[in-house]
Swiss-Prot record:
Enzyme class: transferase
HAMAP family: Tran_acon_Me_trans (MF_00560)
Protein's recorded name: Trans-aconitate 2-methyltransferase
Family the UniProt entry places it in: Belongs to the methyltransferase superfamily. Tam family.
GO biological process: antibiotic biosynthetic process; methylation
SUPFAM superfamilies per record: S-adenosyl-L-methionine-dependent methyltransferases
């Protein structure tokens, strides 16, 4: 795990917005009814906000706050801020997932393709669950493709003789996320009922070097950051990586197939549970306010 999370390019990230949004819609479909109306919802690691708005479609009266610690992502997301068509409200605020804690109870805390950037994130679950309202839900999705060629070849290249010294410790490894069984164990130990599953999507990506174009927006960001001051070296790494990706993911007549495994969890806090949760709160609240809200190392929006 890099010492600082990577910087983000919203335009590059959104080049595959439809494919990246599909896991979020699948996660959304498995979230049960929320205990309050209007519900209070926090989206931790909201990125450019394009999927945060889907929460308002599901819960039109909700007061929703999207959190991220990338200023560029938040700037893009704020185009969606304001009253929603169902009478709710959507806003965005800076926060770092490693230190964020809700200041008021949430009915739903959702985190989509963010927690892989947060070492030891499962240790944060008890505190988050404690701040859920009784009957509230913690829902998350993380990429589970760290053993796929896209990531394995990147790590192997970064660890090669040419690049090892410059890129040591930059890339995440397969321990960045837990197994489905691991998430189930943590969430049930925190007192929740949990629905945990995995899905492998086979995206058909258009264009030349499509897998490279995908990872430029996400997994490759730490390498691009590390070599940012040396454009020649950065381009040389990308050229080497492009060559091995072409062999691993050959283009076909209608695009490049790109299998991508993801892990999901939906954990519901019991209705009668204790802790700090509750369904009170002022109607003017824009969502689950959070402490630890200063902008940290840019980029909780990794997908």
């Amino acid at each position: 795990m890099p010492a600082t999370a990577p910087t983000w390019d919203p335009a590059q990230y959104l080049r595959h917005a439809g494919h990246r949004a599909r896991p979020f819609t699948d996660l959304l479909a498995r979230i049960p009814d929320l205990p309050a109306d209007p519900p209070r919802i926090a989206d931790l690691g909201c990125g450019p906000g394009n999927v945060t708005v889907l929460l308002a479609d599901r819960w039109p009266t909700a007061r929703i706050t999207g959190y991220d610690n990338s200023p560029r992502m938040l700037e893009r997301a704020r185009q969606y801020a304001g009253p929603t068509s169902g009478g709710g409200h959507l806003d965005f605020a800076p926060a770092d997932a490693r230190s964020w804690t809700p200041d008021e109870p949430c009915d739903l805390l959702v985190s989509n393709a963010t927690l892989q950037w947060v070492p030891g994130h499962a240790d944060l679950f008890p505190g988050w669950i404690d701040r859920l309202a009784p009957g509230g839900t913690l829902a998350l999705q993380v990429p589970g493709n760290f053993d796929a060629p896209s990531h394995r070849l990147m790590r192997e290249l970064a660890d090669s003789r040419r690049w090892r010294e410059r890129l040591a410790g930059v890339l995440r490894h397969d321990d960045a996320v837990l197994t489905p069984e691991g998430y189930l164990a943590h969430l049930t130990a925190a007192g929740c009922t949990a629905d945990v599953w995995e899905t492998t999507y086979v995206h058909l990506l258009p264009g030349d070097d499509a897998v490279l174009d995908w990872v430029r927006g996400t997994g490759l960001r730490p390498v691009l950051d590390a070599l940012d001051g040396d454009p020649a070296a950065r381009d040389a790494f990308v050229d080497e990586y492009r060559a091995v990706l072409r062999a691993a993911y050959p283009a076909q007549a209608h695009g490049t197939p790109f299998p991508f495994r993801r892990v999901f969890a939906v954990a519901r806090k019991p209705e009668g549970s204790g802790g700090s949760g509750g369904s009170g709160g002022s109607a003017g609240s824009a969502g689950c306010a959070g402490s630890g809200g200063s902008v940290g190392p840019a980029g909780e929006a990794g997908r």
